[in-house]
Amino acid sequence: MKLANFLVLSFFVLFFVQSAVAQRTVSVLDSGWKFSEGSNEQAFLPDFNDAGWQTVEVPHDWAIEGPFDMAGNGSTGKLPWKGEGWYRKNLEIPAGFAGKTIYLLFDGVMAFPQVFINGQLAGKWDYGYNSFYLDVTKLVQPGGENLLAVYADTRNHDSRWYPGAGIYRKVQLIAVNPVHVDIWGTYITTPVIKPHMATVQIETSVRNNNSVEKQVVVKQTIFNKKGYKVGETSETIAISATGNNQSNSVITLLNPERWEPGNPVLYSVKTEILENNQIVDTYETPFGVREIRITPDHGLYVNDKRVQLKGVNLHHDFGALGAAFNYRAMQRQLEIMQEMGCNAVRTSHNSPAPELLDLCDKMGLLVIDEVFDKYDAKADITDTTNFENFAHRNIRNFVVRDRNHPSIFLWSVGNEMGDVQWDKNGGFNKLKTMLKWVEQFDSTRLTTMVCDSKESAKLRHFDFYDVHCWNYGRRYSLAREMEPNKAVIISESASTLSTRGFYEFPLPTDKTKTTKSLQVSSYDLHAPYWAEIADDDFMWQQDEPYVAGEFVWTGFDYLGEPEPYTNMWAKQNGLSDSVASRSSYFGIVDLNGIPKDRYFLYKSYWNPEETTIHILPHWNWPERVGQNVPVFVYTNGDCAELFLNGKSLGKKCKNPQSANSTERFRLMWNEVVYQPGELKVVAYKEGEMLGESIVKTTGEPVQLLLTPDRTEIAADGKDLSFVLIEALDKDGNVCPLADNNIKISLSGNATLAGIDNGNPQSFSSFKSDNIKLFYGKAMVIIKSAEKAGTATVAAVTDGLKSAESTLEIQ
């Protein structure tokens, strides 16, 4: 949720500026941090000398700079995230803050953070993916300098993917008057929604840190998307000394506009606390009016409209940027997915950055908000004797922080927890504990636990939650048979494996086949033994329309989990750990957001109103002249005719009744004798020509091309431009086999934030100024400075014409 009077300052020593009303001041603590990796028992003391420490900005991931450990664990990215780290920052708290309540709010610290103010422990937290806050009023010294120190320790954190390390999400300092709205203190619901009206119920937790009882007026005002006032009310409540009380307000909203995918209308509530007729606090909360129901036989309805979930799972890293949260990087990920036809996100497998939910609210994406992977060290549970306490405080922060987001339609309390699914005693008790706390803090949404052990349904763990969520291979079928009165979602679908731009022959007859290439063919026919290709999930949803939809594993490639080329695979094949990859092959797009072929398969099915005609593979196969090179076409059309050098190779049509899923959703010419030249496909839909697409045999690369996703970015020190690097032939065609070494230079008001080529086998530094093209492409990420002007990025390589692009920093 957004807090009022948002203020960002970027000096090494942060100065706070109060508003004239002296209400609520929210400051992002992003700059002026000192960092040192390792253990240091004195680092929390104010007089400790940190002059030799690294100056960093927060959010910060200390491990993403590497170096890669070739003998390390590919499952967590082969990066040095295990260890200890210290952060220190000087805060100058103005004298005017005397008498105020001061909080520190951390969106996420990996892991087991300890927070110190002026040498004293302010508090601890454990779960690295969850947000937490501390009241530091008694520890700070208004009118002077204060030392904030944060210790992070990832040694006892366990992970199946790259988690990052350090203060990887936003930190805020919040100064409020003694009477104020609590952190995450509003809860907005719409219990009655009709075409002409909606009842908006606003619960507000108001805190009084004075030593005497206070009577205050709580005023609620609703504003529409244009900023016009559309409703208000107020009530008087008494709050005991050093206590809190709840205000319950109801406003009738006339002719409400609904929030839904495709039309995500947001309202906002401004909550004002008045003491003696003076406003002492203001707090703003966006919300949406929407009615969501999920039925066992007909799936999901939003505002009485059937919506098939076309979702993706997203891990929290941003490739070359690591785990450090960046708003633009997140926004770009969602834009790429939404353009494909995606309408939903699952936050696998942890509570997300709050900005992700803000973006989903604004963009109209539905969300399964998931809090844990397992109930063990992956959730930073190192001692289960206090499980009730752990569950209570973590579920409280998770749900209370997120419950006003209209995008969230389902709470998930965990993923693939075998010890819970198969343990009717201890495991089921843990599950019931988690669900109990979710339902206490939000009774308006349904709950689930994501399952993978099909036979465990016989123990009926689904009796405790609301929706069947199962991963892979129609494993939902038994649970559906045993309990048909609950809706079904495929919470992880596909897990198709591929490497962008890479193809192998012949086509595999075994989906799990691996080769010495350490890559996976982009014909989209590979998957792990437990999973399936995309077409299978499309078919199951067509044949079983009660299934509410799917969440593909995954939207983006991510660091870690490099199935199939893991350390275990290397060992089984008598190879060293050095051959294990650093990042996944699961993504619909690569680690940089460059689409794989599979992107267009999903787009053709999920976004059928937009023309898609995509040919694969590329047509540069000099070693295969006269040999077979199968050609696939992904299109939203029904049929297509393929031509090679002007000669028709026949017309193919999809077969919607086929038991072979690929015949329903792809057009395949499996016997094409390769000759260089031009491959053209003409697609048809309902008998009418839809369009055509051409792939040519390219010449040798002669020039580079730089293509920024945006040429104008904000001069805020955070905004990003993702600049695609490509090698072209003399006719301007992208050379699909180019692997030139590229040198990047940058001048002007920007810095190089990251660089990568999407190759899971690349161990080049993400912070280098050199990159090798991977099948003709790579990506450099440029971050703006805080000063307006321009920045010019240039790319050079031996033997090719260089390229440059100028960005406006505004």
Residues covered by each model-derived region:
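Beta-strand-rich structural segments
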Residues: 202-206, 272, 631-635, 682-683, ...
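Bacterial Sec-dependent N-terminal signal peptides
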Residues: 1-24
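Short, hydrophobic beta-strand segments
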Residues: 136-138, 249-258, 667-674, 767-786
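Extended acidic/polar, glycine-enriched regions
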Residues: 141, 203-295, 669, 675-676, ...
